[in-house]
Amino acid sequence: MRPGLPSYLIILAVCLFSHLLSSRYGAEAVSEPLDKAFHLLLNTYGRPIRFLRENTTQCTYNSSLRNSTVVRENAISFNFFQSYNQYYVFHMPRCLFAGPLAEQFLNQVDLTETLERYQQRLNTYALVSKDLASYRSFSQQLKAQDSLGEQPTTVPPPIDLSIPHVWMPPQTTPHGWTESHTTSGLHRPHFNQTCILFDGHDLLFSTVTPCLHQGFYLIDELRYVKITLTEDFFVVTVSIDDDTPMLLIFGHLPRVLFKAPYQRDNFILRQTEKHELLVLVKKDQLNRHSYLKDPDFLDAALDFNYLDLSALLRNSFHRYAVDVLKSGRCQMLDRRTVEMAFAYALALFAAARQEEAGAQVSVPRALDRQAALLQIQEFMITCLSQTPPRTTLLLYPTAVDLAKRALWTPNQITDITSLVRLVYILSKQNQQHLIPQWALRQIADFALKLHKTHLASFLSAFARQELYLMGSLVHSMLVHTTERREIFIVETGLCSLAELSHFTQLLAHPHHEYLSDLYTPCSSSGRRDHSLERLTRLFPDATVPATVPAALSILSTMQPSTLETFPDLFCLPLGESFSALTVSEHVSYIVTNQYLIKGISYPVSTTVVGQSLIITQTDSQTKCELTRNMHTTHSITVALNISLENCAFCQSALLEYDDTQGVINIMYMHDSDDVLFALDPYNEVVVSSPRTHYLMLLKNGTVLEVTDVVVDATDSRLLMMSVYALSAIIGIYLLYRMLKTC
């Protein structure tokens, strides 16, 4: 509720109180009432006035002197120093100071403050005009809208890629459901707290308002970024040590009230058509926040229509986040991370304003926007929070309701990309129990399609975007383990040396629109064996590109901090080098250079002295158990030929290793087509070399050496395909002869 006239009178009274003279000289006087207040100029002649009921004094009133009673039962006096022996005296009705609200305000004013302390306080905080001198105003028109229109995905798919349609089982359509959804409240987080903001702050009166808090603690309790979101504004609090934190306050700010002698104008750093940015920082902290003096500080966040949520995410948050990630500034508090945190808070603020547009939005577009909001929250936690994170996740009940209702409506979610976002929203809102198995099955099939599409080509920006979302799903759910294991092995198989090399080249490009442009499947995969030291060993004669350390830094930042969603892998120490391969529903392989986990191990004998390679097979239903001791071992069988009959070699992994350097590449082969592709000599996946060997890790727990294998492609399926192809060729030839004779 906004304060009424009585509240504003109380605020006025408090402001007058804060001007109260701290010297020993005071006076009290009354005159004729003017709008329930009294105003006199009083001469004291160098003596204090005693506050007695019948005390009188000589007052100047209309250029004449007269004696007047200075005490009234229904009034409280305020005395302000004008000049030597002269004070301005105000009377305010006593009733304004009764009640808890008045008590709250009065408790925030130090009536015993000395003049010296008052003057010291004047010089404590930085003023924009004096200490920062970087004020800027922006005149762009602000309007809640969506520049992507009805585009169902942020990054559109390539023209030549067919997007699978979603099959949904027959269900009952909820009553009142429509194919479009109003934007009202859709992207507004639940305000589940009542906050007392600015409590105890030197400059601001506290205010009570519905809000939500979100904190990102970098190292300890002293280094953090906090976001406080209210209906009208947000606050970014930046703390570097135990001193008073810096505050960035942005929005519609009539309820942000300053204590005297300060005014809002003293602290306005940026100003737009509808909103203001206040910065409150102590002068002795300016050396740590010197970026506040930069004239382009926050330009990328405020110099366009930031109420356009899609444009804001692209032009502001993703721009800042990409810069932070490429420069390795996560877990640091500097200009880059502060701008990113501000852009994140601004995105939450703008998303809540979407309801002002009052427009209808399609379900796919609404799901994409909501998934984008949750994805930037996930990145903020990944980049800024300590491990394990303590950040409170924001809840979006209206968006969750939309996702649930869409699941009940046949043919409402038409393509797989919308289903990916719907499931992502439910998983990130702690609604895993609502995700049906058929939904994750189709998402896993989509991951396999991307895998097959990019077996012989680099990942597109669209594929990186989709794999980014699916990789997060894998590590944020406990249900539907079979489908999640399939997505996990796809991400692992796509994490090849070729992908890592291409990824480092991408980092050399100066412009990336979205965080997903910097995503590689290696971030969510089971490959934990990539390091600068290992790459240097693999390519001793090559010059390491300057972007390789940045690529490895991004991997370190983006990789999950645990594998706890997989029962047979959760105990693996993530600080050590290994590869985890979930090749099938029941079988996993862990490839290491030492004994690391309990299971059936296959020691590789064809390595040089001093090098070891151990492949351990585990059951997906067996609880992970860490061990450094030798345990059950089996020998590796040498295979000279492979038959594709019955797809016995499907759902397997092809592992390439070097005698001296260990694992080089791992390729996942889901079906017979993948096996043929891998073993076809024209594709140069398996290359004959005296130092290079190839192992096939099968879905039944068997490990084969296939370095010199011959593929028997006589299975019935391939034979039928050959017959069909030959028939098609003959048919085309006959058609050609007929047309030629006409």
Swiss-Prot record:
Keywords: Disulfide bond, Fusion of virus membrane with host cell membrane, Fusion of virus membrane with host membrane, Glycoprotein, Host cell membrane, Host endosome, Host membrane, Host-virus interaction, Membrane, Sialic acid, Signal, Transmembrane, Transmembrane helix, Viral attachment to host cell, Viral attachment to host entry receptor, Viral envelope protein, Viral penetration into host cytoplasm, Virion, Virus entry into host cell. One of its GO terms (cellular component) is viral envelope. Residues 24-719 are virion surface. GO terms for biological process: entry receptor-mediated virion attachment to host cell; fusion of virus membrane with host plasma membrane; symbiont entry into host cell. Residues 217-280 are annotated as: Interaction with gL. Glycans are attached at residues 55, 62, 67, 192, 641, 700. N-glycosylated, O-glycosylated, and sialylated. It holds the Pfam family Herpes_glycop_H. Belongs to the herpesviridae glycoprotein H family. Interacts with glycoprotein L (gL); this interaction is necessary for the correct processing and cell surface expression of gH. The heterodimer gH/gL seems to interact with gB trimers during fusion. Forms the envelope pentamer complex (PC) composed of gH, gL, UL128, UL130, and UL131A. The pentamer interacts with host NRP2. Forms the envelope trimer complex composed of gH, gL, and gO. The trimer interacts with host PDGFRA. The trimer also interacts with host EPHA2. The trimer also interacts with host TGFBR3. Interacts with UL116. This is Envelope glycoprotein H. It comes from Human cytomegalovirus (strain Merlin). The gene is gH.
